[in-house]
Amino acid sequence: CNKLKLDKAERGDKASVDNTELLKWLDLWEPGSVIYACLGSISGLTSWQLAELGLGLESTNQPFIWVIREGEKSEGLEKWILEEGYEERKRKREDFWIRGWSPQVLILSHPAIGAFFTHCGWNSTLEGISAGVPIVACPLFAEQFYNEKLVVEVLGIGVSVGVEAAVTWGLEDKCGAVMKKEQVKKAIEIVMDKGKEGEERRRRAREIGEMAKRTIEEGGSSYLDMEMLIQYVSERSPSRA
């Protein structure tokens, strides 16, 4: 499951980027040097909050992939990108943007990825854990704050951006600042740090990633759970009545 590049690329929706081009770009960078930033398919951030994220990513001086979902391509964000010269600076830095759906599993499994900046949705959390990648946690609403605690406080494989309040759906403009560029920069720098604490976090992430992969192999807990589910459904199928 998800061992072949094609399987990884086709997980979820159709990617909005050429996978060959994406992999060629990733191959340019040293192992563990690239930040992958994606805040899910229903992110509720305003254009100025997305601008803070973009500036924070830029200020780390690390290569990064930034996923801008269709709903996030607002007029305000596009105006800011053009007026502030952000896209021109992006071309000079050679960062990679994905506008739309991202082949997330394919990206996270590449050795160049050193950190996953995520909203901590459960699917993304599991994909980050399974890939063995340290997480920068930026929860926005609902159970994402519990998932943040899991990766930061329980598993010890992540760092929190410091979001203190949930984004209320439909009232994003009234929620105030979720994060500032300085918070983004600081959290990423902690995760990417080459010191003892950073190395231990990466070791833990790799170790837990291997544990997660074993659960879906034959005899693993998830493998057995799926077998039991299939058996349960089959035994109750009308055709067997």
From Swiss-Prot:
It is an enzyme of class 2 (transferase). Gene3D superfamilies: Glycogen Phosphorylase B (3.40.50.2000). Pfam families: UDPGT. Transmembrane segments: none annotated. SUPFAM superfamilies: UDP-Glycosyltransferase/glycogen phosphorylase (SSF53756). CDD domains: GT1_Gtf-like. Its EC number is 2.4.1.115. Faintly expressed in cotyledons, roots and leaves. GO terms for biological process: anthocyanin-containing compound biosynthetic process. One of its GO terms (molecular function) is anthocyanidin 3-O-glucosyltransferase activity. An anthocyanidin binds at residue 142. UDP-alpha-D-glucose binds at residues 104, 119, 122-124, 127, 143-144. It catalyses: an anthocyanidin + UDP-alpha-D-glucose + H(+) = an anthocyanidin 3-O-beta-D-glucoside + UDP. Pathway: Pigment biosynthesis; anthocyanin biosynthesis. In the presence of other necessary color factors, this glycosylation reaction allows the accumulation of anthocyanin pigments. Belongs to the UDP-glycosyltransferase family. This is Anthocyanidin 3-O-glucosyltransferase 4. It comes from Manihot esculenta (Cassava).
